[in-house]
Amino acid sequence: MSGGGPSGGGPGGSGRARTSSFAEPGGGGGGGGGGPGGSASGPGGTGGGKASVGAMGGGVGASSSGGGPSGSGGGGSGGPGAGTSFPPPGVKLGRDSGKVTTVVATLGQGPERSQEVAYTDIKVIGNGSFGVVYQARLAETRELVAIKKVLQDKRFKNRELQIMRKLDHCNIVRLRYFFYSSGEKKDELYLNLVLEYVPETVYRVARHFTKAKLIIPIIYVKVYMYQLFRSLAYIHSQGVCHRDIKPQNLLVDPDTAVLKLCDFGSAKQLVRGEPNVSYICSRYYRAPELIFGATDYTSSIDVWSAGCVLAELLLGQPIFPGDSGVDQLVEIIKVLGTPTREQIREMNPNYTEFKFPQIKAHPWTKVFKSRTPPEAIALCSSLLEYTPSSRLSPLEACAHSFFDELRSLGTQLPNNRPLPPLFNFSPGELSIQPSLNAILIPPHLRSPSGPATLTSSSQALTETQTGQDWQAPDATPTLTNSS
């Protein structure tokens, strides 16, 4: 499936023709990519031109997105193990390759500890301007992993690596190891991120239903979106903004419905008062303040993007399929109406004198199909707000009534499997917005001491299933690159 925005494309009922398929966004800088494993063919967008690793799973969406090179960040230099190349010369990157590759790698989490790691069955599963993604199998455990190989600027620490090393959550793809390797050119250094392998993406799952002319079952929409919001609540509590939320970066296991957020190549620790590039995030999912050129934005840009993903799953197509940066704003205005002067000021004060055509908001009930649950529409409208501070927080989204079915005892997946772990909250998660805990923790999991605490069995579930060691966000981030 080729990339780029569909021709036409206003939301249902707004007067412009729309395609019926899930379109791969054009994204930033470069042209839009194809579907997973596809080729680029869409129109260019607004952004910095970093191809998305849509993901470490069954395929790699090559849509481009904003953000600087993944090798941006604070000072520092490359690490150990740079004397060898990966894959080694002569290794056949085919499906049947039995060649074993051994590298000295550092554990992804915890103290820096190196060990030998052996791989086999190496094959390319995606590439882009960021580098290459391989699939491999750990020789010792036979576990599949994805290896993201990116060119490392020796002058900087790699921001993606620094962020991945501090994240530990059941809804975020885990960094197993990392190692450095040399390139073909002199002094060329590559960083290799060894990540857990997850077979599918929300993009591919949704496209499967669309191709079959089916609507994705609402229970999957609930399970996927809930886990996305939970992952956002966690990274935002760590001071990290993802800055490239889209269906291609949401990995899912089609059997268990576990979702994991991936591709932190555009992510950044946001610090109040420090400027950030607005040329970020794939076009269809860009918050309006980014289109307005804001540099003091907050993590609420991720919430807008998540709202776009929710709307896309409900509609079966992107809700704001802009053909360019300016057209992206037009698509948003066609649904939300012209922003008020105050809303514009909240997004970027420099635009308050700009004259916009006055367009009335399109009723949300007419944007979506008649059978769309009212709670889903209500949640969408609370996420897709012009004013960044008016959007729900990720945990407020988790507590929304749209997800009440997930908190009901006995709810199962359509394949009769149990729901994935949804309530194995760590103490850190429960401390983000404690006032919501009475809603977030289902009645059957509450302890007798009160609704804000989990039962001991649930607490054990937390410890065994997440392995989280939550900590407050760093007061003084070590990453100093201003992008």
Curated annotation (Swiss-Prot):
The active site is at residue 244. Activated by phosphorylation at Tyr-279. In response to insulin, inhibited by phosphorylation at Ser-21 by PKB/AKT1; phosphorylation at this site causes a conformational change, preventing access of substrates to the active site. Inhibited by lithium. Residues 1-96, 443-483 are annotated as: Disordered. Signal peptide: none annotated. The modification N-acetylserine is found at residue 2. The modification Phosphoserine is found at residues 2, 21, 72, 77, 97. The gene is Gsk3a. PANTHER family: GLYCOGEN SYNTHASE KINASE-3 ALPHA (PTHR24057:SF14). Residues 450-469 have a biased composition (Polar residues). Keywords: Acetylation, ATP-binding, Carbohydrate metabolism, Glycogen metabolism, Kinase, Neurogenesis, Nucleotide-binding, Phosphoprotein, Serine/threonine-protein kinase, Signal transduction inhibitor, Transferase, Wnt signaling pathway. CDD domains: STKc_GSK3. Constitutively active protein kinase that acts as a negative regulator in the hormonal control of glucose homeostasis, Wnt signaling and regulation of transcription factors and microtubules, by phosphorylating and inactivating glycogen synthase (GYS1 or GYS2), CTNNB1/beta-catenin, APC and AXIN1. Requires primed phosphorylation of the majority of its substrates. Contributes to insulin regulation of glycogen synthesis by phosphorylating and inhibiting GYS1 activity and hence glycogen synthesis. Regulates glycogen metabolism in liver, but not in muscle. Residues 119-403 form the Protein kinase domain. Its EC number is 2.7.11.26, 2.7.11.1. Residues 1-15, 25-82 have a biased composition (Gly residues). The lineage of its organism: Eukaryota, Metazoa, Chordata, Craniata, Vertebrata. This is Glycogen synthase kinase-3 alpha. GO terms for biological process: autosome genomic imprinting; cardiac left ventricle morphogenesis; cell differentiation; cell migration; cellular response to glucocorticoid stimulus; cellular response to insulin stimulus; cellular response to interleukin-3; cellular response to lithium ion. GO terms for molecular function: ATP binding; protein kinase A catalytic subunit binding; protein kinase activity; protein kinase binding; protein serine kinase activity; protein serine/threonine kinase activity; protein serine/threonine kinase binding; signaling receptor binding. Simultaneous silencing of GSK3A and GSK3B by RNAi stimulates replication and promotes survival of INS-1E pancreatic beta cells. It is an enzyme of class 2 (transferase). Monomer. Interacts with ARRB2, AXIN1 and CTNNB1/beta-catenin. Interacts with CTNND2. Interacts with LMBR1L. Interacts with DDX3X. Interacts with TNFRSF10B.
